[in-house]
Amino acid sequence: MNFKEKDPALWGAIADEEQRQEETIELIASENIVSHAVRTAQGSVLTNKYAEGYPGKRYYGGTQYIDVVEQLAIDRAKKLFGAEYANVQPHSGSQANQAVYAAFLKPGDTILGMGLDAGGHLTHGAKVNFSGKLYNSYSYALNPETELLDYDMIRDLARKVKPQLIVAGASAYSRTIDWQAFRSIADEVGAYLMVDMAHIAGLVATGLHPSPVGIADVVTTTTHKTLRGPRGGLILSQAENAKKINSAVFPGTQGGPLEHVIAGKAAAFFEDSQPAFKEYAQQIITNAQAMADEFSQLPTVRVVSGGTDNHLMTLDLSQTALNGKQAQELLDSVLITTNKEAIPNETLSPFKTSGIRLGTPAITTRGFNADESREVARLIVKTLLNPEDEAVLTGVRQRVKELTSAHPLSQLD
């Protein structure tokens, strides 16, 4: 008896999700579509093996081949980013950040990170998160006129609050970040500099965004998003920080590593190092910029900061009849997947928001080009401006199916 026959309820849910991914235009900026190699590695027998510790220094026997896999992931990550040290064990970006805080700080120390409505992440000091509960957290905002990072404003705030650690990097910021400016601020106030490049790591790896590696004291990232790997985390740093970061990950914040996921990371890092991946990463940016440009020519909606330098953008809906939650649900109904997102100086709750976030990694993986990305922008605005016109919504839904049928997931290796 096969899986489908043994457990039809679970099989059915997985099959339904597979169909949803096949039929929808996926614009959640933190999502992508992994290769067959990544899925094979992650679904391998490595899931059976417990391996507390690090290569060559485990607490269990039978880890000789696990060590090979993890060392491959470490070496490939170091080469990909030009780093002296890499830890591939964090289960997620959030746990990578948690381990860094544990390595460099003590509870009650002050951290300074980007606010949520400016595009920051929960783990950058949000009061509802461990980072805002265990540490004395402050947030910097964007310049209210330009909607860009204002390094003079950040410097003034850093001088005032005197953080032990400054977090640079974002979850929803569409412009190039000046790592050297952050380094200068951190040096002036005597703070460590941590960069969370989770969203842009694939662009950094291909030289399409400046790299923080070697500038920051420590760099964290997820391994999915623009890296197109399995869901997981990664920490990069200088060799001198290896011991305290390793200890903070294990045994400090985690137990046994997920070696099947680490195998998926190794597979992804290999793919990310190939020339074709740089072409792919460039197309991600090209598609995002085409989409942002199209929005600028359409009524009612506005791209925060006026455009994008990377893979994502936040769409300000405050001049429409919809909030972010309503827009997300409406777009879901026409098979376009997005997520609600706070805009700078947000006035609505995090459960509603005044914007939506859009990203192009997944559609670029499917093979969408710039013209198709522009069309997707037009379909989004058409939907948002006609929320109750079933004829319009039906037409959009049909066009989405045509676009996704032209780029089936089955074509991917």
Swiss-Prot record:
GO biological process: glycine biosynthetic process from serine; tetrahydrofolate interconversion
Compartments where found: Cytoplasm
Residue positions, PTM N6-(pyridoxal phosphate)lysine: K225
Required co-factors: pyridoxal 5'-phosphate
SUPFAM superfamilies: PLP-dependent transferases
Keywords assigned: Amino-acid biosynthesis, Cytoplasm, One-carbon metabolism, Pyridoxal phosphate, Transferase
EC class name: transferase
Annotated site (Plays an important role in substrate specificity): H224
Keyword Ligase tagged: no
Main subcellular location: cytoplasm
GO cellular component, one term: cytosol
Matches recorded under InterPro entries: PyrdxlP-dep_Trfase, PyrdxlP-dep_Trfase_major, PyrdxlP-dep_Trfase_small, Ser_HO-MeTrfase, Ser_HO-MeTrfase-like, Ser_HO-MeTrfase_PLP_BS, SHMT-like_dom
Binding site for (6S)-5,6,7,8-tetrahydrofolate: L116, G120, H121, L122, S349, P350, F351
Family membership noted in the UniProt record: Belongs to the SHMT family.
Subunit note: Homodimer.
Protein function: Catalyzes the reversible interconversion of serine and glycine with tetrahydrofolate (THF) serving as the one-carbon carrier. This reaction serves as the major source of one-carbon groups required for the biosynthesis of purines, thymidylate, methionine, and other important biomolecules. Also exhibits THF-independent aldolase activity toward beta-hydroxyamino acids, producing glycine and aldehydes, via a retro-aldol mechanism.
The protein's name: Serine hydroxymethyltransferase
Organism: Levilactobacillus brevis (strain ATCC 367 / BCRC 12310 / CIP 105137 / JCM 1170 / LMG 11437 / NCIMB 947 / NCTC 947)
